[in-house]
């Protein structure tokens, strides 16, 4: 079933500009309180100018362009500007440090980068020390360094015409994005997302929350995440609604922003709910127009009830991952909600619980959550240049192995039990244990290392490191945490350290993690 009618992203934006014209499409609020507004017509023109900018810099269909940006209008301009000329966006998590960012640049084959002055020194170092295909950098800031191969994004964009100059043939099967996501291995994998994937995500997510063109969808989720892109932005734009993108989440500012922009839909993770709940109660707690809060794992029933009661909202549970593009299991408007169920399979999807031999399990039995979709349409196409990893999770008939465990009841409601092996969920970020262990293992005093996730009242899970030192060595907490802060993104730095004489292992030499909780 083709629900997008062969419409790629270039056609989508041209049609939206024609249909909605001067209606507000995008509002961006910076952390400093600066607000930028764009109508559908204006936003399409900015997207066209950005597409022309990339064309003048030599970007053509199939080329990869990396974005290392916080939430800002330029992210939206670049995302769809690249799509209009058939180029491919590679968003980089704005929290990543040099080594991780360099690895994504190398493995995505990105030839151009758009970033800000905040991150530019890191990329100067990358260009000097790492082998990449990067040949040019555009900075979104006004002031520019006097370096070769660096241009002002804004100046170049403003010199471009508002009509598209380069329009190669496009197909909905063309790749629009490669989004690198943490996996159970030490390195992230590039999830290949097509024009069809993004168009479908817009329609699906708008259906999921019954979004109308007179509504406002506000998000504080980072634009480099699939949640912001496919659950929020694509839903809002596909419905002709207004999309509000806040640069940084602030528990103190959140409800004021919801009220100011008259938001009717938002999305959140447990960390957001918990930090909102510790704010002082206010008479304005219920003074808003939110009718649904899209919610992503994992919260106790007591926390859920307290949040809904205090703020007068409903949580609409949605379960998915980067590979599924959208929340393929979730609550449905007009349907009963059965907390702590994560809901039922959405339209265009099938879901099963399978055992270790890939056989379907009956209701009530715990196994792996598996999802059936259409590759490159309702689920991702493949892992970029990684057929082995693709074959490990995708069957030829479209069944995706999530690696998560759960069960279902007799009425088709699914329940999440545990997340995929060796992953830690921290404040909305997936953190690979193996990745952290490989970094920490480079410390000259450390002989053996394992990291685990432990329950955290605010950020889902905290990270605890268990280390065995080389004989005769001592290691202070200060030295350990300083080493981590210098070698990994802030959200990956462990919160706790325990030094042991030995780590528990089974007969095959694998660490028994459950003994370290």
Curated annotation (Swiss-Prot):
InterPro entries: AMP-bd_C (IPR025110), AMP-bd_C_sf (IPR045851), AMP-binding_CS (IPR020845), AMP-dep_synth/lig_dom (IPR000873), ANL_N_sf (IPR042099), CaiC (IPR023456). Keywords: Ligase. The keyword Transmembrane helix does not apply. GO terms for biological process: carnitine metabolic process; fatty acid metabolic process. SUPFAM superfamilies: Acetyl-CoA synthetase-like (SSF56801). Its EC number is 6.2.1.48. It is an enzyme of class 6 (ligase). Pfam families: AMP-binding, AMP-binding_C. One of its GO terms (molecular function) is carnitine-CoA ligase activity. It comes from the Bacteria. Pathway: Amine and polyamine metabolism; carnitine metabolism. Transmembrane segments: none annotated. It catalyses: 4-(trimethylamino)butanoate + ATP + CoA = 4-(trimethylamino)butanoyl-CoA + AMP + diphosphate; crotonobetaine + ATP + CoA = crotonobetainyl-CoA + AMP + diphosphate; (R)-carnitine + ATP + CoA = (R)-carnitinyl-CoA + AMP + diphosphate. PANTHER family: ACYL-COA SYNTHETASE (PTHR43201), MEDIUM-CHAIN ACYL-COA LIGASE ACSF2, MITOCHONDRIAL (PTHR43201:SF5). Belongs to the ATP-dependent AMP-binding enzyme family. Catalyzes the transfer of CoA to carnitine, generating the initial carnitinyl-CoA needed for the CaiB reaction cycle. Also has activity toward crotonobetaine and gamma-butyrobetaine. This is Crotonobetaine/carnitine--CoA ligase. It comes from Shigella dysenteriae serotype 1 (strain Sd197). The lineage of its organism: Bacteria, Pseudomonadati, Pseudomonadota, Gammaproteobacteria, Enterobacterales.
């Amino acid at each position: 079933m083709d629900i997008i009618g062969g419409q790629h992203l270039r056609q989508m934006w041209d049609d939206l500009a024609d249909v909605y014209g001067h209606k507000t499409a995008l509002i961006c609020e910076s952390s400093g309180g600066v607000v930028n507004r764009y109508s559908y017509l204006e936003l399409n023109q900015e997207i066209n100018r950005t597409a022309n900018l990339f064309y003048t810099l030599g970007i053509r269909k199939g080329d990869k362009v990396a974005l290392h940006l916080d939430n800002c209008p330029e992210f939206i301009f670049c995302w769809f500007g690249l799509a209009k000329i058939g180029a491919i966006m590679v968003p980089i998590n704005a929290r990543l440090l040099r080594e991780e960012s360099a690895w994504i640049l190398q493995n995505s084959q990105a030839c151009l980068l758009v970033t800000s002055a905040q991150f530019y020194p890191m990329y100067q170092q990358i260009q000097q020390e790492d082998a990449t295909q990067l040949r040019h950098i555009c900075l979104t800031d006004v002031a520019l360094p006097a370096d070769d191969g660096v241009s002002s994004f804004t100046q170049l964009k403003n010199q471009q015409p508002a009509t598209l100059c380069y329009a190669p043939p496009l197909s909905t099967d063309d790749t629009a994005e490669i989004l690198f996501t943490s996996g159970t291995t030490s390195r992230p994998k590039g999830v290949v997302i097509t024009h069809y994937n993004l168009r479908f995500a817009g329609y699906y997510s708008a259906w999921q929350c019954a979004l109308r063109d007179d509504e406002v969808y506000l998000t504080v989720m980072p634009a480099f995440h699939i949640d912001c892109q496919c659950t929020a932005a694509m839903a809002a734009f596909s419905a002709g609604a207004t999309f509000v993108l806040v640069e940084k989440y602030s528990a103190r500012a959140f409800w004021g922003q919801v009220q100011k922009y008259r938001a009717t839909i938002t999305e959140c993770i447990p960390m957001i709910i918990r930090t909102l709940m510790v704010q002082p109660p206010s008479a304005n707690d219920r003074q808003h127009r939110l009718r649904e809060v899209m919610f992503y794992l994992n919260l106790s029933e007591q926390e859920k009830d307290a949040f809904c009661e205090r703020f007068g909202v409903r949580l609409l549970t949605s379960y998915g991952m980067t590979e599924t593009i959208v929340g393929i299991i979730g609550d449905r408007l007009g349907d009963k909600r059965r907390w702590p169920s994560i809901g039922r399979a959405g339209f265009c999807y099938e879901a099963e619980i399978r055992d270790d031999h890939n056989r379907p399990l009956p209701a009530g039995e715990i196994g792996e959550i598996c999802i059936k979709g259409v590759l490159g349409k309702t689920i991702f196409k493949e892992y970029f240049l990684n057929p082995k990893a693709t074959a490990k999770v995708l069957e030829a008939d479209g069944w995706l192995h999530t690696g998560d465990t759960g069960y279902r009841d007799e009425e088709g409601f699914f329940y999440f039990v545990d997340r995929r092996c060796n992953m830690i969920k921290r404040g909305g970020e997936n953190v690979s244990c193996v990745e952290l262990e490989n970094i920490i293992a480079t410390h000259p005093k450390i002989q053996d290392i394992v990291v685990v996730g432990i329950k955290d009242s605010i950020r889902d899970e905290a990270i605890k490191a268990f280390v065995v030192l080389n004989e005769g060595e001592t290691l202070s907490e200060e030295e350990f945490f300083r080493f981590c802060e210098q070698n990994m993104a802030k959200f990956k730095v462990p919160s706790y350290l325990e030094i042991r004489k030995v780590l528990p292992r089974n007969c095959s030499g694998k660490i028994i993690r459950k003994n370290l909780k």
